[in-house]
Design a protein with these regions (language model features):
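Strand-loop-strand motifs at the edges of beta-sheets in extracellular beta-sandwich domains
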Residues: 9-31, 38-40, 108-130, 135-141, ...
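Short, solvent-exposed loop/turn segments at the edges of extracellular beta-sandwich modules
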Residues: 43-49, 142-148
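Extracellular and select intracellular beta-sandwich modules with Ser/Thr-enriched
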Residues: 36-37, 49-55, 62, 135-136, ...
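Extracellular ectodomain surface segments
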Residues: 1-12, 30, 51, 56, ...
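Calcium-coordinating acidic loop motifs
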Residues: 33, 46, 132, 145, ...
Length: 215
């Protein structure tokens, strides 16, 4: 009949439709949706005739980056000990909406003193520097199989342990004594050459002599 046609009652099977009031609509699919969206609508003419119609819009999937829900806590070790870290631990706060496999890459120390060794079997070894204790922060990337990635942080603590005193210099040479004469021995002389890496005060105990009486 040559009547003018118009579209009314436009509905989408997914997402949000907004009329732009100029003969166009904006369709915003739901977050992370991909697949077909069905459009149902009425085609009307200027004389009241209508017909139901439909169309399909295909939404192409795109890769979504992995996401993390927080910092990974790796616990604590004693000073001088090593820590074995597993990929499962490092991935424990990560997820991927596309259900892709996730991998750990570029694990490194960003705070604290120590080094990381990749054991090549999905585990890593952290070794703190000798005689060091404190807080450690690790950084790494979690990647999916399609190139998506996210940066992650992990923490652990290295707890102090007491270190034994060490002879780090030359021992004092004690003055010679005189026969049948008492000899004064000073703690300060016996401690010469010894040090303690923890900065603890040093004292002398269990002093024994190969001859004579000690008081």
């Amino acid at each position: 009949d040559g009547d003018s046609l118009s579209v009314t009652n436009l509905e989408a099977s997914n997402g949000e439709l907004i009329s732009n009031d100029d003969g166009t609509w904006t369709l915003t699919p739901s977050q992370d949706f991909n697949g077909d969206i069905s459009l149902n609508y009425l085609v009307s003419d200027s004389n009241g005739g209508t017909v139901q119609a439909n169309q399909l819009i295909s939404i192409t999937p795109v890769n979504d980056d992995p996401v993390v829900s927080g910092r990974v806590n790796l616990g604590s070790i004693n000073e001088g000990n090593e820590l074995i870290i597993t990929s499962d631990q490092l991935l424990s706060k990560a997820s991927d909406i596309d259900n892709e496999n996730l991998y750990v890459n570029n694990l490194r120390v960003v705070r604290g003193q120590g080094n990381i060794t990749d054991n090549g079997d999905g585990t890593y070894t952290f070794n703190p520097n000798q005689d060091w204790n404190g807080q450690v922060r690790l950084a790494y990337d979690i990647e999916d199989s399609n190139g998506g990635s996210v940066g992650v942080r992990a923490k652990l603590s290295v707890d102090p342990v007491n270190d034994d005193p060490e002879l780090t210099g030359n021992k004092a040479s004690l003055d010679e004594g005189v026969e049948d004469t008492s000899y004064i021995i000073r703690s300060s002389d016996l401690l010469i050459g010894f040090s303690d890496i923890d900065g603890d005060s040093l004292s002398v105990t269990n002093l024994e002599a190969s001859n004579g009486e000690l008081i």
